[in-house]
Every structure is written in structure tokens, then in C-alpha cells.
Regions:
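A short, conserved beta-strand element in the Rossmann-like catalytic core
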Residues: 14, 124-126
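N-terminal glycine-rich phosphate-binding loop and ensuing alpha1 helix
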Residues: 2-66, 75, 131
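Residue-level signal for inorganic ion chemistry
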Residues: 34, 108, 122
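Short catalytic-loop micro-motif centered on adjacent basic/acidic residues
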Residues: 48-52, 120, 147-150
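Short beta-strand-to-loop acidic/aromatic patch adjacent to the donor-nucleotide binding site
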Residues: 115-122
Length: 156
């Protein structure tokens, strides 16, 4: 079976939050939300993780998350740099911020070379979500098949 990679979008600016919310503890024991996602991902079968981060947050991110996870996963880092754009595309003069999710995933070219799932570093998904997407990807033999896990929300 081809390796299945979990790609984690962790380069968010944190401007509304006021800091790196990816590494902010959410309980008295000091767990961060990504701890729960990675635990559930490991239980589902993921063993390869790619963190998409900003280059300037690498040291703090590795200390808080990456180094701990290397005992469970093969961990890679991709930088969402403004100069890493698809061929023929240039950033407008004066632009300092990277683009969003599409740009982040384009930066994975050459690092992710098979089936993969994508999550946000600061969202909670639960074990079922990871199991369902992993099982789908593991069973898939048709490269033209894709999946998106969606949740229904109760009406307000």
C-alpha cells in the first residue's frame, strides 16, 4: 500500500487570535488542539505528517509540537514562502503575506507524492473523521477519486 500522508495547515497568521494559536494550551494539562488530532490520526493509521508552517515560526513549532511527534510519525516541514508559487505566477509588488490553502498545498510539491488528507492545525476533527478519510484513501485505486469529509450542523 502506498503511504498516506497527513498534511497539516499550520502557517496561519494568528492575527485575529493575537498569537500562534496552534501552540496555545487548551486544557489544564497543557495539551494543544493538534495533540488530539495527531493522536486520532495515529490511531487511524497515519504515519507520515507534513506540517506547513511559516519559516519564522519553525523553531518554536518544532519545540512545541514537531520534536514530540517524531517518535510517532515521520515528520516533514514545508514552508509557505511567498516565492514558492506555481510556475508562471509571481506575487504582486508589495505583497508580504502568503496566499491561503491552495498556495500552502502547492508548496508541498515534491514532498507529498501520494494520497493525502489535509487538516487545519487549530480545528478538532475527532477519531471518526481520521478513520474514515484514512480508510477511503487506503482503499482507493483510482487516482481521479477524491473525498471531502463534511459535518452536518444542527439548525440554529
Amino acid at each position: 500500500m502506498e503511504k498516506i500522508t497527513l498534511v497539516i495547515l499550520a502557517a496561519g497568521m494568528g492575527s485575529r487570535f493575537g498569537g500562534l494559536k496552534q501552540i496555545e494550551p487548551i486544557d489544564p494539562e497543557g495539551h494543544i488542539i493538534i495533540d488530539f488530532s495527531l493522536f486520532d490520526a495515529w490511531r487511524a493509521g497515519f504515519r507520515d505528517v507534513v506540517f506547513i508552517i511559516k519559516r519564522e515560526m519553525e523553531e518554536e513549532f518544532r519545540e512545541c509540537i514537531g520534536d514530540r511527534m517524531e517518535q510517532y510519525f515521520h515528520v516533514s516541514y514545508v514552508y509557505q514562502d511567498l516565492d514558492r508559487l506555481p510556475e508562471g505566477i509571481e506575487a504582486p509588488e508589495g505583497r508580504t503575506k502568503p496566499w491561503g490553502t491552495g498556495h500552502a498545498l502547492a508548496c508541498c510539491k515534491g514532498v507529498v507524492n501520494g494520497p493525502f488528507a489535509v487538516i487545519n492545525a487549530d480545528d478538532f476533527y475527532g477519531h471518526t473523521a481520521f478513520s474514515e478519510i484514512y480508510d477511503f484513501l487506503a482503499a482507493q485505486t483510482d487516482e481521479s477519486k477524491y473525498a471531502c469529509l463534511l459535518y452536518t450542523s444542527p439548525s440554529p
